[in-house]
């Protein structure tokens, strides 16, 4: 596809410490391939994403939640340097909430959807999202919020085992090098172990959620863009084929599939909360009662957005860019059956599935037939993939060393995919 006007620059923003954030790379490639000048603001030096040939420039800026003024100054400097309003695209929770909280100041230099800060925070918080679903009558898994270990055990009697244990604020776990923010506890011992890993002293950070049986393909994703009037200009659905970490994590292999019911319940929910901008939602189909239950809402771009590409090449980032620069967003039809892969994550996930006896190496290779796009590898932009491989090896070696030291010290460890 082609855009009539690509003169407005785009700034991709990440605020959390995640060096292998493939969503940012997807945005860079999606817009720059059409001729849009794209810049990246993040806090990682020499990250794999920096190596993309499509980037016009990289600004290293560290976000401190305790002192956001410094980050705001850094973004203002970027805006002044560009010399004209740029489309601002946050790709993580911290960045999205920062933009919502400081919208008035940022509008001097940037273009972005007008999403109320209260709405963004309500959707990003697992606690407030559950309460919101309950108030609106939107089906969701039963969720409980224990205040201590004893209450966690007591409440698990109410939900039954297995139970899904989640961190209310996964970002707190980055500081403790705990990658897995979601665990399926199948016994009281596993529940207590998960509690010890996820809880934060003096700040309850754990919830218990009803376990809904089903594989990855029972999770339905919605990826969409809503304009300033709340109209959904683009909205696609799809399912997870594999997750990393397995059974609880983000998509490592997904397929675009139309589901009119998920489309309808999602657009009704988004209208009820007054949503604007790019959104990424997850629903799980509960075969026990036939209902789709809302698992989470990302009030921002989802990392798997390039799974959802229309027959005319449209995706939510391109729809956002067109709309914010005053260009029409064409009607688009999803490419049903399109498959998308996060290469390192799916490889790691396949090893776990293999140990569980549900996926052989040959079956894994066969499952990759038909994949149209990888999150990292691109024939026209191969260097980020090579840099990612090197960074992944370095990170794995460091994690192995920390795990060994933790075992010697008797501390709990965890592993996962980012």
Label each PLM-derived region with a short phrase.
Residues 241-253, 298-312:
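Glycine-rich phosphate/pyrophosphate-binding beta-alpha loops
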Residues 271-306:
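Conserved metal-phosphate-binding beta-hairpin within the catalytic cores
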Residues 207, 276-280, 330-335:
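Flexible, glycine/charged-enriched surface loops at secondary-structure junctions
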Residues 120-207, 228-231, 260, 411:
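Active-site nucleotide/adenylate-binding loops and adjacent lid/helix of ATP-dependent enzymes
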Residues 1-115, 150-153, 388, 392-413:
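ATP-binding N-terminal substructure of ATP-dependent carboxylate-amine bond-forming enzymes
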Residues 188, 303-322:
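Gly/Ser/Thr-rich active-site loops/lids in small-molecule metabolic enzymes
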Residues 186-246, 257-267, 284-293:
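Phosphate-binding site of ATP-dependent enzymes
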């Amino acid at each position: 596809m082609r855009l009539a006007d690509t003169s407005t620059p785009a700034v991709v923003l990440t605020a959390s410490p995640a060096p292998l954030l493939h969503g940012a790379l997807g945005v860079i490639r999606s817009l720059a391939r059409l001729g849009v000048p794209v810049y990246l603001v993040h806090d990682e030096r020499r990250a794999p994403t920096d190596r993309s040939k499509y980037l016009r420039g990289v600004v290293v800026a560290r976000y401190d939640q305790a002192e956001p003024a410094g980050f705001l100054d850094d973004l203002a400097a970027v805006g002044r340097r560009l010399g004209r309003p740029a489309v601002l695209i946050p790709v993580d929770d911290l960045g999205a909430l920062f933009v919502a909280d400081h919208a008035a100041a940022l509008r001097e230099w940037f273009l972005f959807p007008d999403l109320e800060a209260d709405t963004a925070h309500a959707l990003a918080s697992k606690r407030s999202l559950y309460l919101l679903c309950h108030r609106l009558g939107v089906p969701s898994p039963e969720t409980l919020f224990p205040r201590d270990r004893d209450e966690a055990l007591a409440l698990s009697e109410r939900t039954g085992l297995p139970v899904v244990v989640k961190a209310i604020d996964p970002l707190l776990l980055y500081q403790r090098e705990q990658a897995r923010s979601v665990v399926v506890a199948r016994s009281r011992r596993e529940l207590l172990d998960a509690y010890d890993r996820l809880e934060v002293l003096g700040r309850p950070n754990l919830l218990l959620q009803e376990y809904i049986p089903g594989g990855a393909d029972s999770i339905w994703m919605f990826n969409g863009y809503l304009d300033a009037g709340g109209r959904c200009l683009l909205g696609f659905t799809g399912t997870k084929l594999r997750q990393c970490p397995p059974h609880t994590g983000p998509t490592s292999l997904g397929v675009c599939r139309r589901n009119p019911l998920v489309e309808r319940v999602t657009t009704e929910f988004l209208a009820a909360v007054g949503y604007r901008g790019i959104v990424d939602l997850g629903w799980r189909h509960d075969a026990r009662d036939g209902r789709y239950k809302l698992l989470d809402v990302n009030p921002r771009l989802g990392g798997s957005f390039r799974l959802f590409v229309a027959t005319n090449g449209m995706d939510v980032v391109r729809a956002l860019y067109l709309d914010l620069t005053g260009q029409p967003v064409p009607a688009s039809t999803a490419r049903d059956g399109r498959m998308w892969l996060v290469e390192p994550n799916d490889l790691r996930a396949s090893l776990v599935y293999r140990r569980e006896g549900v996926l052989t190496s040959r079956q894994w290779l066969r499952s990759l037939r038909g994949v149209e796009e990888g999150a990292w590898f691109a024939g026209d932009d191969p260097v980020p993939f090579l840099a990612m491989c090197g960074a992944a090896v370095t990170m794995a070696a460091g994690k192995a060393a920390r795990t060994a030291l933790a075992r010697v010290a008797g501390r709990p460890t965890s592993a996962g995919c980012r």
